[in-house]
UniProtKB/Swiss-Prot annotation:
Encoding gene, per UniProt annotation: nuoH
Entry keywords, A to Z: Cell inner membrane, Cell membrane, Membrane, NAD, Quinone, Translocase, Transmembrane, Transmembrane helix, Ubiquinone
Enzyme Commission number(s) of this protein: 7.1.1.-
Top enzyme category: translocase
Function as written in the Swiss-Prot or TrEMBL entry: NDH-1 shuttles electrons from NADH, via FMN and iron-sulfur (Fe-S) centers, to quinones in the respiratory chain. The immediate electron acceptor for the enzyme in this species is believed to be ubiquinone. Couples the redox reaction to proton translocation (for every two electrons transferred, four hydrogen ions are translocated across the cytoplasmic membrane), and thus conserves the redox energy in a proton gradient. This subunit may bind ubiquinone.
Similarity comment text for this entry: Belongs to the complex I subunit 1 family.
Listed GO MF terms: NADH dehydrogenase activity; oxidoreductase activity, acting on NAD(P)H, quinone or similar compound as acceptor; quinone binding
Subunit and interaction comment: NDH-1 is composed of 14 different subunits. Subunits NuoA, H, J, K, L, M, N constitute the membrane sector of the complex.
Protein name from the UniProt record: NADH-quinone oxidoreductase subunit H
NCBIfam families, per the entry: PRK06076.1-1 (NF004740), PRK06076.1-2 (NF004741)
InterPro entries hit by this protein: NADH_UbQ_OxRdtase_su1/FPO, NADH_UbQ_OxRdtase_su1_CS
Highest rank taxon of the organism: Bacteria
Length: 322
């Protein structure tokens, strides 16, 4: 067997391991969310299936698998089926350039940040396809809300990272992590971190920025007509998006795998888990604002913060260069 074939098989195996880990983390987060919400609300939560309710996730997956695969009679069948597939795969593909350890990662691209922003933007098409193809007014309104919110906050998501690019001089995520060996970016880039955090919550449509799925207004939004495994793809895709944003926060602002004593993978996993719990805490503690307030907050607060961060970072870099 040639060396090139062995290298190819190793890369495929590495990609499969990362894929299984990402999907497993996203699915397991749904269980952790239910348990933590129950703990904070002084109730039990899922605790009947398996020890401590750990097999509840498997029971839910079996239930979704055997549910009727129903498509509305007036829906556009092809686009209706395509939408959840895009939603599920977009965030998974973005993980290809996230460096987990100094030696572990699927791909090492010099334009890694641009790749993530471009791939994550594909999720907008999934939302639009789902709302339009369902032939349901609530689905359409939810998809319009989601697309407007996502497109707006992706602008702030990208601009909040320009300070890091100016500071490190690279779009490569591995170079950005290596540059944080002495000082994490969250300290000099505190404005960028705050804006990225707000934008990340909005892009993943998580509470309190979950207006596209507001049950009281839109009856669960753009995936109201979905059931079974199609709904499951949307569901797991949302949690994979949370894992992606949490890992990006760790990679870009909190030193990635850097940390004392413990192995790099453990540090990366612990930091990512902390921000995943933070997402759950937001759902448990904050009310949902109106949609116009969410959009106004983005353009009137997040945009000026990102521009100010870019201006200050550029000025500091120029002063240090002289």
């Amino acid at each position: 067997m040639s060396d090139s074939l062995i290298d190819l098989l190793l890369e495929i195996g590495k990609a499969l391991i990362v894929l299984v880990g990402i999907v497993g983390a996203g699915a397991f987060m749904s269980f952790i969310e239910r348990r933590l919400l129950a703990l904070w609300q002084d109730r039990y939560g899922p605790n009947r299936v398996g020890p401590f309710g750990l097999l509840q996730l498997a029971a839910d997956m079996i239930k979704m698998f055997f549910k009727e695969d129903w498509i509305p009679p007036f829906a556009d069948r092809r686009i209706f089926v395509l939408a959840p597939i895009i939603a599920f795969t977009a965030f998974i593909l973005a993980f290809a350039v996230v460096p987990i350890t100094p030696t572990w990662g699927v791909a090492d691209l010099n334009v890694g940040l641009l790749y993530i922003l471009a791939i994550a933007g594909l999720a907008v098409y999934a939302v639009l396809f789902a709302g339009w193809s369902s032939n349901n007014k609530y689905s359409l309104l939810g998809s319009l809300r989601a697309s407007a919110q996502t497109l707006s906050y992706e602008v702030f998501l990208g601009l909040s990272l320009m300070g890091i690019v100016i500071q490190t001089g690279s779009f490569n995520l591995r170079d950005i992590v290596e540059a944080q060996a002495g000082l994490w970016n969250v300290i000099p880039q505190i404005l960028g971190f705050i804006t990225f955090l707000f934008a990340g919550v909005a892009v993943t449509h998580r509470h309190p920025f979950d207006q596209p799925e507001a049950e009281q207004e839109l009856a669960d939004g753009y995936h109201i007509e979905y059931a079974g495994m199609k709904w499951g793809l949307f569901f797991v895709g949302e949690y994979i998006g949370i894992v992606l944003i949490s890992s990006l926060i760790v990679t870009l602002f909190f030193g990635g795998w850097h940390g004392p004593w413990l192995p790099p993978f453990i540090w990366f996993a612990l930091k990512t888990a902390c921000f995943m719990v933070f997402f759950i805490l937001l759902r448990a503690s904050l009310p949902r604002p109106r949609f116009d307030q969410v959009m106004s907050f983005g353009w009137k607060v997040c945009l000026p913060l990102t521009l100010l961060n870019m201006l200050v970072t550029g000025a500091v870099v120029l002063m240090n260069a002289q």
